[in-house]
Amino acid sequence: MKFLFLTLVLLYFTAILVFIVFPSYAQIQTNASCTTSTHCVEPCRKRCLLIHKCINDKCTCYPRINICEKKNN
């Protein structure tokens, strides 16, 4: 019974971490407008970031993937 309780608590905190903390941490919104994610390739590339999503008609980049660092290595 104790093991089941600890497992449920661990799953609960994992769900919070994955669905609440990570998405808000991972996105940088640019000033570029978009209708699809394809329109965000160039604005995100200018900031040395790969495309992430088109959210609310604004390009949103993913800051952990840095194109410039990968090209320099």
UniProtKB/Swiss-Prot annotation:
Post-translational modification, as annotated: Contains 4 disulfide bonds.
One Pfam match: Toxin_2
Name this protein carries in UniProt: Potassium channel toxin alpha-KTx 27.4
The UniProt record lists the keyword Transferase: no
Record-linked InterPro entries: Scorpion_toxin-like_sf (IPR036574), Scorpion_toxinS_K_inh (IPR001947)
Coiled coil: none
Domain of life: Eukaryota
GO CC terms in record: extracellular region
Molecular function GO labels: ion channel inhibitor activity
